[in-house]
Regions:
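Short, charge-patterned binding micro-sites
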Residues: 55-87, 117
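Short amphipathic alpha-helices in soluble, non-transmembrane regions
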Residues: 95-104, 142-152, 202-204
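Helix N-cap motif at beta-to-alpha junctions
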Residues: 88-93, 137-140, 193
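Short, low-order "capping/linker" segments at domain edges
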Residues: 120-139, 172-174, 227-229
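Ordered, amphipathic secondary-structure segments that act as subunit-interaction surfaces
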Residues: 79-132
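Extended, well-folded interaction surfaces typified by the phenylalanyl-tRNA synthetase beta subunit core
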Residues: 19, 24-26, 30, 34, ...
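Core RNA-modification/binding signature centered on pseudouridine synthases
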Residues: 15, 150-229
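Charged, low-complexity intrinsically disordered regulatory segments in eukaryotic signaling
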Residues: 2-15
């Protein structure tokens, strides 16, 4: 007896269940010098080594069903990186966290595993990004704070021979200075991903240029929180 023909595009009744899981991780120390695309490659190779059962895309170029958060600028540390992967079976979150941390390189650490995970509807209002900016000099930190909080602070970005002018505008929502031992922290809240609003990466690069000979006092940038607006 001939088998019934499956119609193109129709899902099989026996299609495996899929379980979306969010992995939150940090990038610190030397890992902050790993570029975004290299980070993706490291994580995908780690998942393959673990022989984790995950869903894949359809079509000619099969790849894991995985998505990543916004790129982290090179040289910035972060405690709020993440990726969302679709697994073929419900994970044991603690075992998955431990297994990933065993395989990932130094400086990359899984902080938590969230399951089940439901994607939020992405709006078009951009992102709020919180940073800790580290300084070895109070005077330099205060100079940075004043520049960041001035909406009229201006800078240029030259890319592929084209010059574009920016102002801080509404990109910096707040910047508060606190003492940390012998150093100083600038807790800054940024908005990015909106029209004519410069990214944090562009602002921080311009800030270092503005500090001029004092730029060496500005020694570490940490992304500590990220949320969609």
């Amino acid at each position: 007896m001939p088998m019934p023909r499956r119609l193109p595009g129709r899902k099989s009744m026996n299609q495996p269940a899929e379980y979306k899981t969010r992995i939150n991780y940090s990038k610190t120390r030397q890992a902050r010098y790993i570029a975004h695309l290299d980070t993706i490659d490291i994580i995908c190779k780690t998942l393959r080594r673990m022989q984790l059962s995950y869903a894949v895309t359809q079509g000619c170029h099969v790849r894991p069903k995985i998505s990543f958060g916004p790129p982290l600028p090179l040289g910035h540390a972060s405690f709020c990186e993440y990726f969302v992967i679709t697994l073929c079976q419900p994970p044991d979150v603690e075992k998955l966290k431990s297994a990933l941390n065993h395989e990932l390189p130094q400086g990359m650490e899984v902080l938590s595993v969230e399951f089940p995970w439901a994607d939020k509807k992405s709006g078009s209002a951009g992102e709020q990004v919180d940073y800790r900016l580290h300084f070895s000099s109070r005077q330099t930190a205060e100079q940075a704070r004043i520049w960041l909080l001035n909406p009229e602070s201006a800078f240029q970005v030259i890319r592929k021979g084209t010059t574009r002018n920016y102002t801080i505008g509404k990109a910096v929502q707040k910047a508060e200075l606190t003492e940390a031992g012998n150093n100083w922290l600038l807790q800054a809240e940024f908005i990015q991903g909106q029209a004519d609003v410069p990214s944090v990466s562009k602002i921080v690069t311009a800030l270092a240029a503005h500090l001029d000979t004092s730029r060496d006092d500005f020694y570490l940038m940490e992304r500590i929180a990220l949320k969609e607006l």
